[in-house]
Amino acid sequence: MKLKVLETFVSVQGEGPYQGLPSYFVRCAGCNLNCAWCDTKELLKKPGRDVEVKELVKEAVKALSNGVHHITVTGGEPLLQQEGVNNFISQLLTEVGYTPIVIFTNGTIPLQKECDALWHYPDYVVDVKPPSARVRKPFVFPLTINYMTVHLKTVVTCEEDIYFVDSFIKTYLKNMKLSFIYYVNPTTQHIARKVFKEVLRWNKKYPLLEARMHLQAHKVWGLQ
């Protein structure tokens, strides 16, 4: 089985639950969105290359043996290739047993029931797209599955985006019975001050929600 891949590399994890830790990255080709401020827009124009899953597993195992903490599957949108990603995770688990794996997704692709490893093993960082992304796709990611570790994330560039996050929390998380971490990434100091006030309010109002101000640290450090 093959995955269509744009690149693989080792770098520091810039965001999410494993921020600051070394990771082996698999960047999948293809995306179903075209976000206005996408940071890989030029790269995503490329078709990618077909790579055997067993070769990716071999690279990942080598990286783990050389000090990498976890595996990151990103894009693009990796869930456009669910069968291949599921196969990659399954083969990797067979080789090394437990190792942390995180998948970055935009939350607009339904998980296929037959992809068992995708439901039971990886952590997810779900990038919830605000109005400033200028994309319209329904959010369909299953937030209520109690055996999945899901973290939410939104890049906030303006006040409209803050209102969007507030509305999303009310719509999807108001009656939640599971705890969630929601990373809110303000892009300017002005917006950051406003976001901080809302983070305080959200965390007070929703006991199972842990809203956090967040940033893409790899960009600050000048790393890939």
Label every model-predicted segment.
Residues 2-37:
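N-terminal pre-triad scaffold of radical SAM enzymes
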Residues 3-7, 34-122:
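Conserved Radical SAM active-site core
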Residues 13, 57-61, 170:
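Generic structural signal for well-ordered alpha-helical scaffold segments
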Residues 17-19, 23, 33, 77-79, ...:
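Short, flexible micro-motifs
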Residues 25, 70-72, 125, 153:
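Short aromatic/hydrophobic contact patches that present stacked aromatics
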Residues 31-35, 63-66, 141-144, 176-177:
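Short amphipathic alpha-helical segments, especially helix-boundary/capping motifs
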Residues 80-224:
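Conserved AdoMet/S-adenosylmethionine-binding subsite of the radical SAM
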